[in-house]
Amino acid sequence: MKKLLTSILSLGVVCSAALAAEPVITAVKVSESLDAVKADSAVWSKAKFETVTLYPQTAIEFNDKKANELTAKVKAKKAQVAALHDGKNIAVLVKWADKTKDVEQCMSSDVYTDGFAVQFAGATKKAEPLPYIGMGSSGRPVVVHLQKATAKVYEPNGNKDVAHQINRQQTGVFGKELADFDAKVAALADTDYERVFVGEGFRSLTEIKDGSVKSNSAMAHGPAGWSGSLVRPLKDEYVNLNGTVPVSIAVWDGSNMGRNGLKNLSSWVAINLEGQKANAAMVAELSTDAKGNAAKGKEAAMTNGCNGCHQLEATDAKSFMGPALHNVGGYSTAAYLRESILKPSAVVVPGYNRNAHANTPWYNIEKGKRVSTMTDFSFLDKATVEDIVAYLKTLKAEVE
C-alpha cells in the first residue's frame, strides 16, 4: 500500500510538471495606427486572446507582517492577454478579475492601489539567455512599463507654485474666486500614473525621464475587473522587438496591500509578431514543458540539501538563507532555474537583512560584486539537473 501511495504521489508531481508551459501569443498585424489605442478601442476585436497565469511573488518577503499574511493566502490569477502590432508599435491588452477598485488617493500612507506592468527584455547582442524575471540581471536589461490606478495625484513639479498648495479654507476667497482656485488646483493634478523603468537587476531599477521612450498605457475597471492597455514602439534606445517578443505581466491588488514586490507575476511569455520570422528556440523554451522527472527531481533536491537553505513547499518552515521557492515554478523559466543550479551567482536574489541574521549570510562581496553563498552544483549530471528543474517547475500556488 505504501508503495502504491508513493507511486500515486510521484505521478501527481509529474502531471503537475506537464502544466508548466505558457501559451504563445500572436500579435496580429493591423493596418490601423496603434499610437492612441486604449482598452476599449475597436481594433482589439481583431486580437487573439490567450490565458496567462500570474503567480504570487513570494521569493522576497516584506518587513510587513500583515502584508505577508495576506500574501500567503493569495492564489494565482488567470489573465487574458492579447497583442497587436502595426509594424512600428506593439500594443498589449491585459484583462484580469478584481472585484474591488483600489485607487491611489494620496490621502493616506497605508492605502494601496491596483496596477499592472508589462516587462520587455532589453536589446542585447544575443536574445538568450533572457533576463531574470525580477527587474533583469547584469548584462541582461529589462524595460518595465508601470501603470497605477489613480484619481488625483499631486507631485512636486518644480514650478515653485506655493499659492495653489494650501488648503482651500485658508485662501480667504469665496464664491467665484474660490471656484477659480479649485479649478486651478484640479488642473495641476496628475490623473495618469504611468512610469517607465530600465533595470539590470536588483537595486538598479531607474525611471526613464528624458522622454526617450514614447509609450501610452491606461487602466479601466468594470464589473469583471480591470483592463490594462499599453502601446509602445517596437524599437527605441532600449529595445529592439522583432520576430518573437518575450514579455512578463504583473498585477497588483491594493486590497491585499500590494505594492513593489507584493504582486502576481507571470513567467516570460512569447509574443510572435505576425508577418515576421519567429525565434523558434525562444518559443520552444517558453512554451515547452520541463523534460525531467519531477519525482526524481524532488528526491535529488532533498539529497543535495536544497531544503536546507530554501523553503521549497508552502508548508515547509521558512528559511533565513535563500529565497523562498514555493512559487518559483510559476514565474520562472526552465532556463533560469537551470542557470541558478549551475551558476548560482548569475542572479543573486535579495534575502533577509544580513545584520539581523548574521548566521545565514546569503552572499559575500568579491571584487565589488555579490557572490552567492549557494553551492555550485555544476558537478551534477545533466539528467539530475533536468529532474530538479522539472520538480521546481511544479512549485506554484493554486489558481483561483
Regions found by a protein language model. Name each.
Residues 278-302:
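Electrostatic cytochrome c docking/interface patches
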Residues 156-221:
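Long, low-complexity, polar/charged, intrinsically disordered or flexibly structured peripheral segments
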Residues 281-283, 366-400:
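C-terminal capping alpha-helices of c-type cytochrome domains
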Residues 218-287:
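Long, compositionally biased interface segments
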Residues 37, 89-96, 226-232:
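Short, well-ordered beta-strand segments enriched in hydrophobic/aromatic residues
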